[in-house]
Amino acid sequence: MSNTDNSDKNTKPTGYRPPQTDFNTEFGNNLDYPRLGSVSFRRGTLTDNQESLWDANWPILGKDLTDAEDQRIDVAEWFGRCGHKTILEIGSGTGTSTAAMAPLEADTNIIAVELYKPGLAKLLGAVVRGDISNVRMIRGDGVEVLTRMLPEESLDGVRIYFPDPWPKARHHKRRIIQSGVLNLIASRLKPGGVLHVATDHADYAEWITELVNVEPQLEFMGWPWDECPQLTDRQVITKFEGKGLDKDHTITEFLWRRK
């Protein structure tokens, strides 16, 4: 087992932080966006097998958010097929639900976004070993990926499962569910596209509930939504969901439709 993750050391200087956009200036509004000044690429140790698998497969199945001004993705070229729905999962973690859901929606392109490299390495391993052909991965902050890498009305769905609740009041400004992010997601969704959010944190659920109608382009559909055009059953209990259930937390889910 390797004790170091040399790949990051070769490509990113010490203290490197992902590019951070001034969203209010970028979009010309005064909406609320996460303030993530302390966020950086999280380091972690990969096993030798994970490193070998990463080196062999990441150039094909993965992309890194960089300092380049424009990294727009050609989804059809990346997946090698045209005319298929595309769903973005923000904060895929170790990819447990991603890998479980993908085979059930093989006609849908799934793009998993995560900062933590060992989490992406686990998902990459599951994708390669399971011969899952409809998953691609991006290493970067989800809001920046939406801004820099995805054109308007390019997505059929966005999933945000168990985002960091940032429970301390002084950290609430870091929560991803904010008025500005909902506006950004709405702009990237096609009409009829679906936003699905799940949390096990009661205070965060209340926070989100106060925002369900804040974005005029999104129609809140509640939960469950029997006629939802996309898969909403996560199939497995994710790591963070399991921790919440162990503490008797209630899972609260939200669904919106792009008008």
From Swiss-Prot:
Gene3D superfamilies in UniProt: Vaccinia Virus protein VP39
CDD domains named in the record: AdoMet_MTases (cd02440)
Positions with a binding annotation for substrate: K168, D200, T238, K239, F240, E241
UniProt-annotated binding residues for S-adenosyl-L-methionine: E89, E114, D141, D164
Associated pathway: tRNA modification; N(7)-methylguanine-tRNA biosynthesis
Top-level taxon: Bacteria
Residue ranges of the region described as Disordered: 1-29
Catalytic class of the enzyme: transferase
Alphabetic keyword roster: Methyltransferase, S-adenosyl-L-methionine, Transferase, tRNA processing
Molecular-function GO terms, alphabetical: tRNA (guanine(46)-N7)-methyltransferase activity
Documented EC number(s): 2.1.1.33
Stretches assigned to coiled coil: none
Keyword ATP-binding recorded: no
UniProt cross-references to Pfam families, sorted A to Z: Methyltransf_4
List of catalytic residues: D164
InterPro entries: SAM-dependent_MTases_sf, tRNA_(Gua-N-7)_MeTrfase_Trmb, tRNA_methyltr_TrmB_bact
GO cellular component: tRNA methyltransferase complex
Residue ranges, compositional bias (Basic and acidic residues): 1-11
Record bears the keyword tRNA processing: yes
Catalytic activity: guanosine(46) in tRNA + S-adenosyl-L-methionine = N(7)-methylguanosine(46) in tRNA + S-adenosyl-L-homocysteine
Similarity section: Belongs to the class I-like SAM-binding methyltransferase superfamily. TrmB family.
Role description: Catalyzes the formation of N(7)-methylguanine at position 46 (m7G46) in tRNA.
Protein name per its UniProtKB record: tRNA (guanine-N(7)-)-methyltransferase
Gene this protein is translated from: trmB
